[in-house]
Amino acid sequence: MVKICCIGAGYVGGPTMAVIALKCPSIEVAVVDISKSRIAAWNSDQLPIYEPGLDGVVKQCRGKNLFFSTDVEKHVFEADIVFVSVNTPTKTQGLGAGKAADLTYWESAARMIADVSKSDKIVVEKSTVPVKTAEAIEKILTHNSKGIKFQILSNPEFLAEGTAIKDLFNPDRVLIGGRETPEGQKAIQTLKDVYAQWVPEERILTTNLWSAELSKLAANAFLAQRISSVNAMSALCEATGANVQQVSYSVGTDSRIGPKFLNASVGFGGSCFQKDILNLVYICECNGLPEVAEYWKQVIKINDYQKSRFVNRVVASMFNTVSNKKIAILGFAFKKDTGDTRETPAIDVCQGLLGDKANLSIYDPQVTEDQIQRDLSMNKFDWDHPIHLQPTSPTTVKKVSVVWDAYEATKDAHGLCILTEWDEFKTLDYQKIFDNMQKPAFVFDGRNIVDADKLREIGFIVYSIGKPLDPWLKDMPAVA
């Protein structure tokens, strides 16, 4: 029986291994992690991550051929294939701080694999890693291997949170990169055979190691670039009276461009886009390509600009001050159908409003109060380092209350900001909300999900990103 072990029970490792276990009943899959609480959650009814469809998959396989354990060494020792799905956060200090990936967790995983292995193994990079990581890992493994042979493969994930299970069941492509030696090709074939149990052969692509590593960074950079492109257009639309939804629809009907990732918003978030682009920028700089680095940096600059532009619009619209005004924040996760708040634009928007002394009342159907308070009191890039290195009791941000209901959040508020496109926000009773808000009542729709004309009929002053401005907003001072 082939045995697979995955180090790291997070957003990537957990769902990926659960689906492999479901689709390959003859393979024994173990997901290991040093976090006792995380493994306990995977073994309970309350999984540590929210992902539609994940519950069902885990329940079908857990205890049969899918196991979650803190006994890392035992399962690595037994495995034929070891997936490494540990965090690769952005470095917060030292060489390349703020851009380079921190490979501390990766390196310690590699050293541990070398230590405990008594038989040849295939080691698979699953986390997003900088190009040439495989080479570094290979050196660590071979120098500590005591005669055991390791083959390194790169098998980047292309999951979107909120649709991870669907993406795993029916992927656009599975990418496997390996060495161009006979041993390397044999390792690629072994992993290919696992995926081939449910993925059509033509969707399994094989490349060399570097191409596979770079493809992941490039894919995320291209996606983020599309969002920044449409967000840049949204600023121009507001200035000229064009409607960004009409513009992006017209552009998206061009079959060479296509309609996906062309929704203007308050900005992109998530654990990968910014991190991967910074990483790409760093790799370009290290390879003496400053023009290329500058090009990709601009994607992040536009994203930061879009978030600060939103905050400025809120403050400018409300008579240039939000001091001690209650503002309702609807949505805190970086997108709908996930509880993930990593790099969510909501953090920067909330911090911007708090900087102007606003009182915030926040509601998100999937994010806990503890998480929101932690996010708002954290330094940049801290979120990606393990919780035990973060402040233990997050200092409660005084002017923030977290509530469990949209109507509670908006009661007596001067304005409301929609920062996540949860479906439930489309069907709220906005008349009821209007009646319970201070007047004039403002809606700042950071996701373009509400019908602005209907809200104006109720009496709201509405700002939608990239849409012709409400006459009221035109009188306000221009946004700096």
From Swiss-Prot:
EC class: oxidoreductase
Binding site for substrate: 157-161, 216-223, 256-269, 334-335, 447
EC number: 1.1.1.22
Pfam families in the record: UDPG_MGDP_dh, UDPG_MGDP_dh_C, UDPG_MGDP_dh_N
Keywords on record: NAD, Oxidoreductase, Phosphoprotein
Pathway: Nucleotide-sugar biosynthesis; UDP-alpha-D-glucuronate biosynthesis; UDP-alpha-D-glucuronate from UDP-alpha-D-glucose: step 1/1
GO MF term set: NAD binding; UDP-glucose 6-dehydrogenase activity
Gene3D superfamilies xref list: Cytochrome c1, transmembrane anchor, C-terminal, NAD(P)-binding Rossmann-like Domain
InterPro entries linked: 6-PGluconate_DH-like_C_sf, NAD(P)-bd_dom_sf, UDP-Glc/GDP-Man, UDP-Glc/GDP-Man_DH_C, UDP-Glc/GDP-Man_DH_C_sf, UDP-Glc/GDP-Man_DH_dimer, UDP-Glc/GDP-Man_DH_N, UDPglc_DH_euk
Annotated GO CC locations: nucleus
Reaction catalysed by this enzyme: UDP-alpha-D-glucose + 2 NAD(+) + H2O = UDP-alpha-D-glucuronate + 2 NADH + 3 H(+)
Record: residues binding NAD(+): 8-13, 33, 38, 86-90, 127-128, 161, 272-275, 342
GO biological process, one term: UDP-glucuronate biosynthetic process
Phosphoserine: residues carrying this PTM: S393
Active site: C272
Domain of life: Eukaryota
Family: Belongs to the UDP-glucose/GDP-mannose dehydrogenase family.
Function: Involved in the biosynthesis of UDP-glucuronic acid (UDP-GlcA), providing nucleotide sugars for cell-wall polymers.
Protein name per its UniProtKB record: UDP-glucose 6-dehydrogenase 1
Species, as recorded: Glycine max
Designated gene of the protein: UGD1
